[in-house]
Amino acid sequence: MKKTLIAFFLLSTVVAMAQKPRPDAFPPVPDTLSPKAVTMATTLEEMDSWDKYPTHEVYIAMMQRFVDSFPELCHLDTIGTSVQGRLILSLAITGSSDNDLYRPEFFYSSTRHGDEVTGFYLMLRLCDTLLRSYGTSQDITSLLDRTRICINPLSNPDGTYRGGNHTVVRAMRYNANYVDLNRNYPDPFGTDPLEPLQPENEAMINYVSQHSFRLSANLHGGSEVMNFPWDSYTSFEQLNEHHEWWKQVCKRFVDTCRLVDNQRFRDVTNSGYIVGGDWYVISNGRQDYFNYYHNMREMTMELSSSKTLSTTRLNHYWQCQSHALINYIKEIHNLEDTSTVGIVAPVVNMRVYPNPTTGSVTIEGASASYRYDLSDRPSGVYILNVEGRHVKVVKH
């Protein structure tokens, strides 16, 4: 027994030394960022230099200006509202060619943890770059003509603007109910979260259910590493079926960033990427939920070692990561069956019926057909168990 305990201790020590703990493994610490390190843009014109964070009012105005300036390329969707009534917005961007039916849908979503605002800034700048480059950059024009890109720069506005709409200095991880939104999704492998499903997450689930996203990423901060499924298991316990694909995608992302700054993405693993559960096992996370239930491949991008970068460093992070962020969108065209968006497709132990139904749906089992009448049910997403496999039905 003594030898076993010693061996366990030595193994635990080696593992702990091999990689940095996940930033959300520890309790929150008091605010340490000096207000002098953060400059806020109080007008649209001040934001044009891209060396500031926007106030909440400027953020909303920026999203509207994208639509006003490029109405033929984008429109604004309201995903929902936060606990305190702030809008959760998504900008849908696509080109003007005629093959709209066959464009796969891509999704970027940032700042689920309100104090991790690097992605917030990067997503706003990405929106601006995609729109301004259409028609002048052959690469971007081709991408938009073949892809529908939805970008949600800020998914936890109450956490980001906890100190008031004028500043991000006192941003916090949680929403206004002090719930960690990345521990609040239904867990396909475990139990439901302790807290009720929060308005921000309910809105996000409904929004994703109305789309056919094939590839997505949610953006975080506090470390620099590409975190791919599963979060609920170590790679020893259960490999994601796309494990090797994820490794190659992550490697391409990291390698692209290191062409600009070779020191990036080294504070967790030397490779710059890791299976989420190998870093730190969590339950009720967004990544596993969307991968399992929504026929989409989503990863977690930890983009900066500092959760809230000083504004003097923002431009460097954009220069380092912008090409990688764009190239990740292009990965959607390397997926199998990209042209069959909206068609029934197998995913692990689940089949997905994404086409809306207003009444009954018939699902083919191995030995029989099963009819489910949803006519008296409210609109929403239904996860049904048919002969031991999960089936998703979306009702409008």
Summary of predicted features, one role per range:
Residues 1-4, 395-396:
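Positively charged n-region of N-terminal signal peptides that target proteins for export
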Residues 16-18:
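Boundary at the C-terminal end of the N-terminal hydrophobic targeting segment
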Residues 4-13:
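Sec-dependent N-terminal signal peptides
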Residues 54-106:
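Soluble metallo-hydrolase cores and metallopeptidase-like ectodomains found primarily
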Residues 344-396:
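C-terminal outer-membrane/trafficking sorting elements
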Residues 100-112, 116-244, 248, 259, ...:
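Active-site/substrate-binding loop(s) of hydrolase catalytic cores
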Residues 216, 221-239, 274-336:
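Active-site-adjacent mobile loop/cap segments within catalytic or ligand-binding domains
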